[in-house]
Amino acid sequence: MEPAAGFLSPRPFPRAAAPSSPPAGPGPPASASPRSEPGVLAGPQTPDASRLITDPRSGRTYIKGRLLGKGGFARCYEATDTETSIAYAVKVIPQSRVAKPHQREKIINEIELHRDLQHRHIVRFSHHFEDADNIYIFLELCSRKSLAHIWKARHTLLEPEVRYYLRQILSGLKYLHQRGILHRDLKLGNFFITDNMELKVGDFGLAARLEPPEQRKKTICGTPNYVAPEVLLRQGHGPEADVWSLGCVMYTLLCGSPPFETADLKETYRCIKQVHYTLPASLSLPARQLLAAILRASPRDRPSIEQILRHDFFTKGYTPDRLPVSSCVTVPDLTPPNPARSLFAKVTKSLFGRRKSKNKNHSEEQDNVSCLVSGLMRTSIGHPDVRPEAPAASALAPVSLVETAAEDSSPRGTLASSGDGFEEGLTVTTVVESALCALRNCVAFMPPAEQNPAPLAQPEPLVWVSKWVDYSNKFGFGYQLSSRRVAVLFNDGTHMALSANRKTVHYNPTSTKHFSFSVGSVPRALQPQLGILRYFASYMEQHLMKGGDLPSVEEVEVPAPPLLLQWVKTDQALLMLFSDGTVQVNFYGDHTKLILSGWEPLLVTFVARNRSACTYLASHLRQLGCSPDLRQRLRYALRLLRDRSPA
């Protein structure tokens, strides 16, 4: 589409009369989606006049849609050309905000710098015009908003995700610097995400031409948390300042907050000038090394864009070709396509657990239950009076939780575990990485303390494992939830549960396939599993006591209880991973328990030796610290999760 107007005039031109009727053509009605195809419209419609934007020179009309964002000078809306149905992001700047010459000059500068940029990772400039009320800048629409929105939903990202986004930022930034343009406001909110998850650098409101050092402007500009020390010291803004901002972006995505962020702006600026920040030990060594290289006080000491791309963080770490859309709100399952990793996974499964049968009779595409289960392994439970051995946990001697040296920090001696469990839906890797990111962010920044902060007065009801039995040498792992639902994760990876009232059986051959039966109508092929499930339920009811004094949860409040995806036993604790992201760690020696749940926000529930339970916001623990008892268990849980991570 050709620009509808030339350059901005030095002064607003007279108000143009709005057309008496919308232009001919299939313009979408006010209630239509801005991206509606012309062919599906019933014919010319008359949109609400207040939503129309008309180019005074060409007469072309646009329908203003949803608000995409707003800043100090402008608001950004989705806008659709009524003739072509092409959707744009339009930046609307009131004339009243650019009444002074220097204000108007900034807008002219932004347009002049942006209009000729053509790069895959730069937001595309389309055209602009103005009327008596506003200036309109039409840009490429990035439908998934910005990296700031993803960060707010996720708080921290995985290192492969950070590499994925940084590579695109670096590509766009390299293009800008080669054309002699400094962005000067690199931050999460200025990295926009398209429908197919590509990143585009945008918002050139503070951009400037690169000048020789002696001619650079000394003004302080940018966003406080991302401003380089030389800018604060009024030494001018060069390419190295953009690199500094990029380092702050990388740190924020990996650690959950900007490196120099404080509650006071003066203190933030002091930390920036002194380069005073903390590198969490939970980050990988290449990530820490790259951040330390970028965030250096002297611009001359910082790496160039080419040097950053050659760093081990990028060359030796996995970068996905594309991120799933779901990663905007939840941790993605990122498994590198590595033959060695696949071989290792097969060996691990052969040692620690059997996967469910994949013979053709067990096809997940068949909807008929009898066909679905016809190929299941038939398991005989023997004589009904045969009792399973006592739970393995009860036979273990108390163990110490004294921390070991860093080089021996991974939990050793896994006694037993399940396999990968379900192969579809929310995976073990997803749960592990999500918990790992959240927990390491909490532990890494936690200050020393002698006692726990105040717990939540009325936490939401929590579904947790109150009893468990490990009989995986024959059948599987049985457990009872606090809602009184009893379930078994069988050795073949299937899952069966009995409702709290013992009237309904829930069967999951995979995490995305679910069948419910009344107890009296369970198919014959599933009767062996039901017999085992009932026996587990009876054993736990008669021989085991509830593992803590958390409030009971009525099953009606939990219509879809979490499924156990995987369990792992070490010499000190039992780790359980659930399909809703809940992580529970039971410590054998003193019967304490740690439960991570919620995620938005993350909740940490600690069941102490005396069976009393308290729930804390992870953000409070991060800010205020916690007792040595809880800290040790959080660190052990972190090591357990790290040991399960494929990274």
From Swiss-Prot:
Entry keyword annotation includes Nucleotide-binding: yes
Annotated region described as Disordered, given as residue ranges: 1-56
Protein localization: Cell projection, Dendrite; Cytoplasm; Nucleus; Nucleus, Nucleolus
Induction statement: By the intense activity associated with seizures.
EC number: 2.7.11.21
Any single biological process term in GO: negative regulation of transcription by RNA polymerase II
Annotated binding of ATP, by residue: 68-76, 91
Catalytic activity annotation: L-seryl-[protein] + ATP = O-phospho-L-seryl-[protein] + ADP + H(+); L-threonyl-[protein] + ATP = O-phospho-L-threonyl-[protein] + ADP + H(+)
Annotated Pro residues bias: 20-31
UniProt keyword list: Apoptosis, ATP-binding, Cell cycle, Cell projection, Cytoplasm, Cytoskeleton, DNA damage, Golgi apparatus, Kinase, Nucleotide-binding, Nucleus, Phosphoprotein, Repeat, Serine/threonine-protein kinase, Transferase
Span of domain POLO box: 464-542, 563-646
Quaternary assembly: Interacts with GOLGB1. Interacts (via the POLO-box domain) with CIB1; leading to inhibit PLK3 kinase activity.
Protein family membership: Belongs to the protein kinase superfamily. Ser/Thr protein kinase family. CDC5/Polo subfamily.
Domain notes: The POLO box domains act as phosphopeptide-binding module that recognizes and binds serine-[phosphothreonine/phosphoserine]-(proline/X) motifs. PLK3 recognizes and binds docking proteins that are already phosphorylated on these motifs, and then phosphorylates them. The POLO box domains mediate localization to the centrosome.
Protein's UniProt name: Serine/threonine-protein kinase PLK3
Record organism: Rattus norvegicus
